């Protein structure tokens, strides 16, 4: 794994940065006795990020923004299968490739020394970017006549459904929040008045295939 980072500061209060990072998540094995996937390989990711951090208006306004892209190979996902004996097991498999891209924005404003107003917003577009035609984790012909392969909970037609461009599970497309914190000094200490609000977009829970 490696990380390359380039920083540029046009002023004392502003920073631009560009980074490229690689990483991986180790593979493993599935514990289900009737699992169609005894083992799965490691997951690899390459991330690209361009961002800005800056303070303005006599350091009363702070703006942080970034745009990013993650490219996954053999990304880990869950898949449910049914054995020829009728048992159901949940296994981890590696989907060939996926891509996540989006941007984040954070703004913090201090109208008075004891009053802070802030908010953030993020947008994420996470999709599978390569086909998989075999629910058993293999690209190619489904082994319909293999008596040793557990039967899928999905039909053969559903197992052949392409996933290129399908949204990834459990990743909200939009998230945002806002808050206001006012600090009142009193004898012997202080009192904070905090009000916050947050919202998260709907997510997909079902399997990709």
List where the protein language model places each region.
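Residues within well-ordered beta-strands of beta-sheet-rich folds
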Residues: 5-7, 51, 179
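Membrane-embedded beta-barrel scaffold of Gram-negative outer-membrane proteins
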Residues: 9, 15-25, 41-116, 120-122, ...
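Gram-negative outer-membrane beta-barrel transporters
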Residues: 69-71, 93-207
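Juxtamembrane/interface motifs at transmembrane-helix termini
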Residues: 37-38, 83-85, 138-139
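Transmembrane beta-barrel architecture of outer membranes
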Residues: 1-3, 35-37, 45-49, 175
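Extracytoplasmic loops and strand-loop junctions of Gram-negative outer membrane beta-barrel proteins
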Residues: 1, 31-36, 85-92, 157-166, ...
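Signature of Gram-negative outer-membrane beta-barrel scaffolds
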Residues: 1-11, 35, 133
């Amino acid at each position: 794994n490696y990380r390359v980072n380039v920083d540029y500061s046009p002023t004392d209060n502003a920073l631009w940065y560009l980074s490229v990072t690689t990483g991986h998540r180790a593979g493993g094995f599935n514990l289900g006795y009737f699992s169609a996937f005894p083992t799965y390989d490691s997951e690899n990711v390459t991330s690209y990020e361009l961002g800005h951090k800056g303070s303005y208006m006599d350091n009363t306004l702070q703006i942080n923004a970034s745009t990013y892209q993650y490219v996954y190979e053999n990304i880990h996902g869950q898949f449910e299968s049914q054995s020829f004996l009728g048992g159901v097991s949940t296994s981890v498999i590696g989907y060939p490739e996926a891509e996540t891209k989006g941007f984040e924005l954070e703004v913090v404003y201090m109208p008075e020394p004891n009053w802070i107003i802030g908010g953030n917003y993020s947008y994420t577009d996470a999709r599978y970017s390569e086909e998989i035609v075999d629910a058993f984790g293999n690209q190619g012909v489904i082994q319909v006549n293999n008596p040793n392969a557990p039967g899928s909970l999905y039909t053969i037609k559903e197992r052949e459904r392409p996933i290129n461009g399908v949204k990834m599970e459990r990743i909200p497309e939009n998230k945002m929040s806002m808050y206001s914190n006012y600090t009142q000094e009193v004898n012997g200490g202080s009192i904070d008045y905090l009000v916050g609000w947050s919202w998260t977009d709907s997510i997909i829970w079902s399997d990709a295939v």
